[in-house]
Amino acid sequence: MSSHKKSAKEYMGRIRHANNPPYPPKIRRALSCALVFLLSFSLAAGLLIYSDLSGRVNNLGASSLLGRTPPDSYDGRALNILIIGSDSRSGKGNQTLTNNDDPTERSDTTMIMHISKDRSQVNVVSIPRDLIVDIPSCQRSDGSSSEPQRAQFNWAYSIGSLGGDRASAVVCTWKTVEKLSGIRIDESIVVDFNGFSSMIDALGGINIYVPTKIKDQKNSGLELEPGCKHFDGKQALAYARVRHGVKGSDGSDIQRIQRQQAVMGIMMRAALKKNMFTSLNQLYGFVGNGLGALTVSEGLSSVSQLSGLGWSLQSLKPDNLLFLTLPVYEAPFDRNRLLLSEKKAEPIWDSFINDTPLPAGVEVRDGNGNVRTITEQTPASQTPQDSSAPSAAPSQTPETSESTTQESKPVQDMRQSGSLNSELSPEELAELQRKCEARN
């Protein structure tokens, strides 16, 4: 049991207001994807309305639990950011770390965002919540620590949250991701889903093409026929999160991840279409809703650093923002659990660690909503860097050893993952979505 004790208040900081906020410039080239979208919440606040809105960003304060000093600059190096979607359903949209009333809050969505050294490429990999992983011992802010265990991935967040605060939950997920991947995570962002919903409402809703029938009366109450739908924030959130009652779906997390990635892209394109980043009045309301939904690590709570990072990404091309999902297969001991296909995952991890292009054969969804397979090198920094990866490499246990028998039931067909369980091809679905978004 660790003797390291600190109160929650020591971990939960607020960004101080600037004495002289900068005059708001017009951002001429808006960021063009859901990932950078998360960063743009804080970026826009820092550049445009910092004196009022920056106090709404929650500072995680996790460095002392990780035993690290926050980085003082992002210049000249690649960056790996852990993004966690909070599964707290307590009804409070903007929980702070000091009043979190859900001690077993779970991570509903987890992604690693890799920003290349030259800022020309952003790759985002989603980690299924049902993936069985090795969860290391995690120190909590109340002085306790957990035992190492093998369990479902999103348990890491729950195990950490038993310390009574979000910092402990994030750190346990952070350490689990590093152990799984060998990637050194630099920063983290936790997104409260209630804030996600309110931001969609600030857009006036979004248009989504639903490719297949959904009837989930027992869980979400969602009932949808195929076709173009206009969703408010609550409806869009329910659609992004639904797992059961989706025609053609096995109820796994893979198809839900694909829907979430698609909805984030739709949300960002809607913001661009409505000129949210060039109209100060609209930006104020839009960003104001988003900032309260974010809890960030110390490096991202620095407005000067975050502004510089966000500004350096303003020329990012949508084609160079790529979403992908880890290659997994059905666990032989439980059809509702997943195991990592390590041989297929290793080249993906290596591309993040060395800041090199994604490997050929990986299917991705780009910032324009198009699904494609990597056939040649994508633009990125070509010079491998010393990313100071954790000393513990991903472990291979008997439970994760790959064999032809174990992988006979792949959960994710890399050539079909963009179809979202419909009879439509990824290309057909992308075209229908474009037409749907074009409607008023």
Model segments located where?
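Non-catalytic, solvent-exposed segments at the cell envelope interface
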Residues: 2-440
